A protein has these predicted regions:
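Class I SAM-dependent methyltransferase SAM/SAH-binding core
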Residues: 81, 88-139
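Conserved alpha-helix/loop element of class I SAM-dependent methyltransferases that forms part
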Residues: 58-76
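Class I SAM-dependent methyltransferase Rossmann-like catalytic core
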Residues: 34-38, 43-62
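A short glycine-rich, Lys/Arg-flanked "PGG" loop and its adjoining helix->strand segment in the class I
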Residues: 164-176
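A conserved beta-strand element that flanks and buttresses the S-adenosyl-L-methionine
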Residues: 150
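C-terminal alpha-helical "lid/dimerization" subdomain adjacent to the S-adenosyl-L-methionine
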Residues: 185-233
Length: 233
């Protein structure tokens, strides 16, 4: 909750809508265990919104900016895709940001059935209809008539050998003047700078309540699953 001033009446507490959407705290890596490769399964889907908020610096700000960009560049009678839509939280934000009279179709794709199930619950009261499709971004996708295609921290999970093909599919799916919005974790070519970014990132996670054990175990689980590239790549 936060404080807001009522003119002439001092302060009152106001519950943030954002906090209401996060109901399950991420404790998946809290206890020592044999680390398995990270999967987007039921356990992860249940806590994923909290995991994102506490793992990615300026996550909410990036989502807000992406929604504003979509609202500006979405064209009437086209589709807006969220590739790797996970729990549907960005699609909901997008549905709230888009003008209702543009006849825009919102489509979310994800390979995880658990995530899509969670997304359907998230989007139950969406002001715009959203179509949910189970699809693997490592395989040939059937997407078209897109004025905007969004990838929020998703390309890094696509196998490196498949990324070029996926980007070509995305390009060919865009209508003239269409846009792709890519938000991604990247590595630096400068080793010292890259280490500094990693140190700052771990510090951020600790400030958000993660222990050193949680950070270490999750990092190990993501090894060879999340593979960031440099900007130049």
């Amino acid at each position: 909750s936060n404080l807001s001033r009522i003119p002439g009446r001092g302060f009152c507490f106001k519950e943030c809508l954002r906090s209401k959407t996060i109901t399950n705290r991420d404790t998946l890596f809290q206890k020592p265990k044999t680390t398995e490769p990270f999967e987007f399964n039921d356990s992860v889907a249940m806590v994923f919104d909290d995991m994102l908020q506490r793992s990615i610096p300026m996550y909410q700000e990036c989502q807000d900016l992406a929604a504003h960009w979509c609202a500006k560049y979405a064209k009437p009678s086209t589709s807006v895709y969220d590739l790797g839509c996970s729990t549907g939280s960005f699609l909901l934000k997008l549905a709230q940001a888009l003008p209702p009279l543009k006849n825009i179709k919102l489509i979310g794709l994800d390979s995880s059935q658990a995530m899509l199930k969670k997304a359907k619950g998230t989007l139950r009261n969406s002001p715009l209809p959203c179509e949910m499709i189970q699809a693997d971004l490592n395989e040939n996708l059937s997407i078209d008539n897109a004025s905007v295609i969004v990838m929020n921290y998703t390309l890094q999970f696509v196998r490196p050998s498949n990324r070029s093909t996926l980007l070509k599919i995305i390009y060919n799916a865009l209508v003239p003047g269409g846009s792709m919005i890519l938000i991604e974790k990247v590595n630096s070519k400068i080793p010292g700078l890259n280490k500094t970014f990693i140190d700052f990132h771990h510090q951020f996670k600790e400030e958000k309540g993660y222990s050193k054990l949680e950070i270490s175990q999750k990092r190990e689980a993501l090894e060879n699953v999340l593979i960031p590239w440099t900007v130049e790549q």
